[in-house]
A protein has these predicted regions:
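Juxtamembrane intracellular "pre-TM" segments in multi-pass secondary transporters
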Residues: 1-9, 191-220
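Loop-to-transmembrane helix entry/capping segments in MFS-fold secondary transporters
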Residues: 44-45, 132-142, 246-247, 329-339
């Protein structure tokens, strides 16, 4: 028993390190995606194609999650995880050999497909190996390591560009990519059989069994996604209005990422204490972010970045932990896939709406108030319903 606990803990940290090194590759490559496409003489549609890759990745999350739920195979789940990380580890460094903007855009899209393939199964495994010491804490530590890689990757690429150029910058990302593959295979070797899969004798098809609480959670989170402004839109607004320079916007984003990393473990700890009630902080923070962005003096923009960073952290930690809390283990792959698709779709729709309304601050604020208010009310209902269901089981 003691050996199993140690092995599970080792696998947990291995998966965290896998995300760290894989994010060095992904974020390192993404940090210069627009500049690299421009360097290859790409038209404005070039960067937009990368956005299509993000959407395709969300669709693949659902497909991978559905297949993992139907077949209930530990090997299949691990296969999706290993294949997904391998795709990222290869596709981004291959950019070093591209001379066509279209091929470069395709490689960026392929990377997003890799994330879509691995994400639901990875979250299932992280949830399982975190249960002994707390889902919130587990996903919080995982997000902290993930963000550490997201910080180091762009830094390595930036330094490489100064001294050696694009090709060397991309080739250097082969190193963390190779390390991520070795680590994820090591994790599989140590923990090849998932108890959440092996205990299921006959898999259920379809969405039956996800439960009313899960769909209420999806509705609340989708409303949040509609009202949560993407950083790209925010930075466009700040630039077009002359509020901040490019350098200052980049610095504000760095603050957001730093906050994301710093609050990951504390937020996870709070989640383990009060469960779904911690989700209630998100809609007010999302609305506060919009208010500061639109109406506050430029000196307070860093405070907006803090709000944005906390919400992003919650999306990558406690929102993932919430699914593991409210969905039975055998249904988690499908739940993660369905949630990822719907959340990503509504966030994209919200982005288009904000882009359309951006010329009128009052309209932007009205949309933000409406969506975040709905989200808050649904999260309150969700929290109450979860507590009632939990008390009935005692």
């Amino acid at each position: 028993m003691e050996n199993r606990v140690k092995r599970v803990l080792i696998v947990f940290y291995l998966l965290g390190l896998v995300s760290l090194f894989a994010d060095m590759v992904y974020e390192g490559g993404r940090s210069i995606s627009g500049a690299y496409l421009e360097n290859l003489a790409a038209p404005p549609v070039g960067p937009a194609l990368i956005g299509l890759g993000d959407f395709a990745g969300y669709v693949l999350r659902f497909i991978a999650g559905y297949l993992a739920t139907v077949y209930q195979s530990s090997k299949l789940l691990w296969g999706f995880v290993i294949a997904g990380y391998t795709v990222t580890a290869i596709s981004i460094p291959l950019l070093a050999f591209t001379y066509s903007w279209s091929i470069a855009a395709v490689l960026y899209m392929v990377d997003r497909l890799g994330k879509g393939l691995r994400a639901p199964s990875r979250d299932v495994i992280v949830a399982e190996v975190s249960e002994d010491f707390g889902l919130g804490k587990g996903f919080g530590i995982h997000e902290l390591l993930d963000q550490f890689g997201a910080f180091i990757g762009p830094l390595v690429v930036s330094v490489s560009l100064i001294y050696w150029g694009y090709r060397t910058a991309f080739l250097l990302l082969l190193i963390p990519g190779a390390i991520s593959i070795v680590l994820v295979i090591s994790a599989f070797t140590l923990y090849p059989s998932l108890k959440s899969v092996d205990r299921v004798k006959k898999p259920e098809l379809g969405f039956k069994g996800l439960g009313e609480v899960f769909w209420l959670y999806v509705l609340a989170s989708s409303a949040l996604a509609l009202g949560f402004m993407h950083w790209a839109i925010s930075s466009y607004y700040l630039t077009s209005r002359g509020v901040m320079s490019d350098y200052e916007i980049g610095l504000a984003y760095t603050i957001a990422m730093l906050v994301d990393a710093l609050v990951a473990i504390p937020l996870g700890h709070v989640f383990d204490k009060i469960k779904l009630k911690v989700l209630l902080i998100q809609p007010p923070l999302s609305l506060l972010y919009i208010v500061i962005l639109l109406y506050a003096p430029r000196e307070l923009i860093p405070l907006a970045a803090v709000c944005w960073g906390v919400i992003m952290c919650s999306e990558e930690s406690i929102m993932r932990a919430s699914i593991a809390l409210i969905v039975e283990p055998s249904k988690r792959p499908l739940a993660y896939g369905a949630f990822g698709l719907l959340y990503g779709l509504t966030w994209a729709i919200g982005g288009f709406v904000y882009g359309f309304l951006l010329g009128n601050n009052l309209h932007v604020l009205t949309f933000a108030v409406a969506t975040n208010t709905v989200s808050l009310l649904l999260y309150i209902k969700l929290s109450n319903k979860y507590e009632i269901n939990t008390s009935n089981l005692k």
